[in-house]
Amino acid sequence: MKLLTPSAGTPVSSLYLLKGLIFSFNKSTITFETTIKSYTNKKYCYFANSGTTAFYVILKALRRISKKTEVILPAYTAPSLILPIKKAGLKPVLCDISLKTFNMDIKSLNKCINENTLCIVPVHMFGLPIDMDAIMKIAQQYSTFVVEDAASSLGATINSQPTGVFGDVGFYSFNRGKNLSTLSGGCIVTDNEEIAKEIELEYTSLPKLGLNARLKIAARLIALAVAVRPLFYTILYKKISKLKHTTLHTDFDSFIYTNFQAGVGCALFGHASKIFNKRYDHGAFLFDMLKGLKGILLPKLLPHSVSVFNQFPILFGNEEFKEILYKKINETGIESTKLYPDPIHRVYNLGYDLDKDPFPNATYFSRRLLLIPTHPFMDIEKLSIIVKIIKDGLLSGMHVRYDT
């Protein structure tokens, strides 16, 4: 039987689940809060049921402080980020991405920021740190807040400091596909007392789940811990594939993070460096094996940073060639993904003229991106198979044959 390897997965052992259960009876959220404060060296920390809710709480807090209404984010990122912006009564404004760094393009950001910009949302895409110094300098010129989206970059660093700590406020995600997963969950960190005060008001208004709902989340977390392991993923694949999101989210629920999840998160964080190091090692291996090859682009990494690859991004010069390699890689049992098939301005009607594409890089990127899993259930042998498929395809001239 050929074992399948999922595109995402955090190794949550039965011991971690047991520790999570024990912690959940001992104010585990407070313990996890202390852990995150220590990791980020931040004074304030708040948990919610998702990164989306964390972002929403931040935006609601900033609205209490400022009358500005525009929120700038990259045109290629999670489309779900639009939902909390609109729900908070704010206006999303997009800027293009860089085909060099795969992150927000600084020149494009400079063109769309103005006196009505409430905040800039730099996203560390794929666990690749963005140039936060450049972002902060631009924000300071306009007295604009910076909300640092470190949802996919937990464990990554810039100048030995973790991503998520450079903006006025930052947030992380513990969702299924993130670097450290407790099924779902989000976390806010800040040192800004004014922002923290307003976040506290929003946070305390979040509802707490009843016992049945908490038990369901615990059961789903345990099921996920089993399902992401290659053997069980293979056995359960038909059922699991039906549960994967294929439709666009139109809303989101907000509530308090559960004690059991906080307990598991606390247990996981004690061994987080092993998980982060695996992701880095796997990404570094792919980078070394694929750099310099004609027909593909790899991200230019920020100097003095460490990327903890959420997944490893490869940009192909040709869309049809990417599709062929995507199928070949998945036929080996290793689940590569294409992430978001369209940039945000082609998903939601935000008033942009699509005939004159205002964000050509984001559109180009969405059509040619392929992501390779880097989580701890991967290994060098599996990664070498992927490298061979890509190199063989490039050496055969297949990518040239499909060029238009």
Report residues per predicted region:
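Active-site phosphate-binding strand-loop segment of PLP-dependent enzymes
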Residues: K100-E198, L371
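Conserved PLP-binding active-site segment in aminotransferase class I/II-type PLP enzymes
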Residues: M1-S66, A88, K274, A284, ...
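Active-site PLP-lysine loop of aminotransferase-like
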Residues: F171-L183, L201-N212, L221-A225, I256
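Conserved PLP cofactor-binding pocket of PLP-dependent enzymes
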Residues: L209-I217, F285-D288, P303, K322-P358, ...
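Conserved glycine-rich beta-strand-loop-beta hairpin in the small C-terminal domain of fold type I
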Residues: D253-F269, Y280-F287, L298-L315
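Conserved PLP-dependent catalytic core of the aminotransferase class-I/II
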Residues: T35, S205-K208, S273-P299, I324-T332
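Conserved PLP-anchoring active-site segment centered on the Schiff-base-forming lysine
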Residues: I58-I113, V121, I329
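Conserved PLP-binding active-site segment of the aspartate aminotransferase-like
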Residues: S173, F309-N318, Y348-D355, R367-D379
